[in-house]
Amino acid sequence: TNEVMQRLRHLLRHQKRFVRDASHQLRTPLAVLKTQVQSALHGDVEPQQALHEISDTVDRATLLANQMLALAKVEQLRQQSAPPATRFDEVLRAVALEISPLIAQRDLDFGIHTEPALVQSHEWMLRELSRNLLHNAVRHAPPGSELTVDLRSDGRHVALTISDHGPGIDDELAARLFQPFSAGDVRTGSGLGLAICHEIVQALEGSIALTNRVQGHKVTGLDAVVRLPLPAPLTDSAPTAQAAQ
């Protein structure tokens, strides 16, 4: 059918773009790694220092590769129909517990409030969304500051709000925050973390926004807000057995 052909064409375009972007992005850490190895072989740097630098480069390349695979997985799951219903609140609390050592390391005053929320989504998507947003907030929250997570439902949507007390974001940067591999994305390092979040939210027919909190003329922090639709309530429109008789 036309719908199937459109989905196949979309998938093919996405795969071509992914291969092009992936090859371009991996070229940089591989070039850096080669330079570091050559410097070590020539004795330009101390062996211990060279090993530390090489290890850091490998870690960055591994993170980048994993994030690119996550982007590809989002598209793969998007093509599947009828995702299961998943408790967003349970996933969110599990991720918060998972990164609690990072929160403690930065001595953050961390608070989390959740309400039961059932979302039509693969658990992996909600987990990846929560992990990327929380990691981003923890990394950029000033040590010893407050970081709050709030998940609430209004009956039609569930809203996740993550509020930090960091420096916020520049207006110029905000326009390209959710683009894969965006240059100058200082809040995500490789420029993929928020792009993954954006793709997941789009796949779930929701919205995501990053907004500076301002008091007077001073930025006091950043709010990351995700809104996802709740499943429509089931309606029994079929006739009962008694009515059929």
PLM ranges: what are they?
Residues 1-14:
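Amphipathic coiled-coil signaling helices used for dimeric signal transmission
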Residues 76-81, 114, 118-124:
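Conserved micro-motifs of the catalytic ATP-binding
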Residues 137-138:
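Short helix-loop "hinge" at the ATP-lid/N-box region of the Bergerat-fold HATPase_c
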Residues 164:
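Acidic ATP/Mg2+-coordinating residue in the GHKL
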